[in-house]
């Protein structure tokens, strides 16, 4: 397996992460990227994104509050990413509830590129054509067959797929990881999943093995959450502590403290 200095390599490059994301968590995504050691750019005007992607290190597309203008921008950005060899992370927020989002994902796969799909277990199982339990943008799924769903979807789109829940699952279609770190408090603040998607974009920007980089991003969020909860047991203070601990997280810490089963 490739050397696992994922965070170190990311911080050495300070990658520019182009985010087309939702209005609910745009500030959270920008702040967590800064704390992690990346440089966020929240550029979504459809007449600007093609050029901006060309100078970016990774593109993060979050479908949470998808407008028609964002859809146009996301597709154009993905075309630029394909033309300029920029990795793309897709977060299919709420796709079981709004089928149009699946059409957007398929369009991006057709004309652009997808390197990572990161969603909750319900979203990933839905995209894989499996029965899933969701409510709005939240997953109610118990995680059964989640790794199989990741594997099927990874083969379909030829990309990395990550499904988050009580346990987190990652697959590239052949290899996989199961991550057992985290805290329930991450479900009590809006945007934890969106922030994780941004971290996935940061870690994949300059790291070839994207199964490892995605696993590292999830470990970073989960372990920062565990440490934040040790000092802050209420949602407001926990959110602040989470950002602080992302700032301090290291490769040594995530691989030593991480509870990961490689498949």
UniProtKB/Swiss-Prot annotation:
It is an enzyme of class 2 (transferase). It catalyses: 5-(2-hydroxyethyl)-4-methylthiazole + ATP = 4-methyl-5-(2-phosphooxyethyl)-thiazole + ADP + H(+). Substrate binds at residues 42, 191. It holds the Pfam family HK. ATP binds at residues 118, 164. GO terms for molecular function: ATP binding; hydroxyethylthiazole kinase activity; magnesium ion binding. Its EC number is 2.7.1.50. Pathway: Cofactor biosynthesis; thiamine diphosphate biosynthesis; 4-methyl-5-(2-phosphoethyl)-thiazole from 5-(2-hydroxyethyl)-4-methylthiazole: step 1/1. Its cofactor is Mg(2+). One of its GO terms (biological process) is thiamine diphosphate biosynthetic process. InterPro entries: Hyethyz_kinase, Ribokinase-like. Keywords: ATP-binding, Kinase, Magnesium, Metal-binding, Nucleotide-binding, Thiamine biosynthesis, Transferase. NCBIfam families: PRK09355.1, thiM. Belongs to the Thz kinase family. Catalyzes the phosphorylation of the hydroxyl group of 4-methyl-5-beta-hydroxyethylthiazole (THZ). This is Hydroxyethylthiazole kinase 1. It comes from Clostridium botulinum (strain Kyoto / Type A2). The gene is thiM1.
């Amino acid at each position: 397996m490739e050397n696992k200095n994922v965070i170190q390599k990311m911080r050495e490059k300070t990658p520019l992460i182009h985010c087309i994301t939702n209005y609910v968590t745009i500030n959270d995504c920008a702040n967590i990227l800064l704390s992690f050691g990346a440089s966020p750019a929240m550029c979504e005007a459809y007449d600007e994104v093609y050029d901006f992607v060309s100078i970016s290190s990774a593109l993060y597309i979050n479908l949470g509050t998808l407008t028609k203008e964002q859809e146009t921008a996301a597709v154009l950005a993905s075309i630029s990413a394909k033309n300029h060899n920029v990795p793309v992370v897709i977060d299919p927020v709420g796709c079981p509830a709004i089928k149009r989002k699946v059409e957007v994902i398929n369009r991006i796969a057709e004309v652009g590129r997808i390197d990572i799909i990161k969603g909750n277990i319900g979203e990933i199982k839905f995209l894989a054509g499996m029965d899933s339990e969701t409510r709005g943008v939240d997953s109610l799924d118990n995680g059964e067959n989640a790794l199989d769903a990741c594997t099927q979807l990874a083969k379909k789109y030829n990309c990395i797929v990550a499904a988050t829940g009580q346990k987190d699952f990652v697959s590239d279609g052949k290899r996989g990881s199961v991550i057992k770190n985290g805290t329930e408090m991450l479900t009590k603040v809006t945007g934890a999943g969106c922030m994780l998607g941004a971290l996935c974009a940061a870690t994949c920007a300059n790291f070839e093995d994207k199964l490892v980089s995605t696993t590292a991003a999830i470990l970073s969020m989960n372990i920062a959450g565990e440490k934040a909860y040790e000092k802050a047991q209420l949602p407001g203070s926990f959110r602040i502590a989470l950002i602080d601990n992302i700032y301090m997280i290291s490769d040594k810490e995530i691989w030593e403290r991480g509870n990961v089963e490689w498949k």
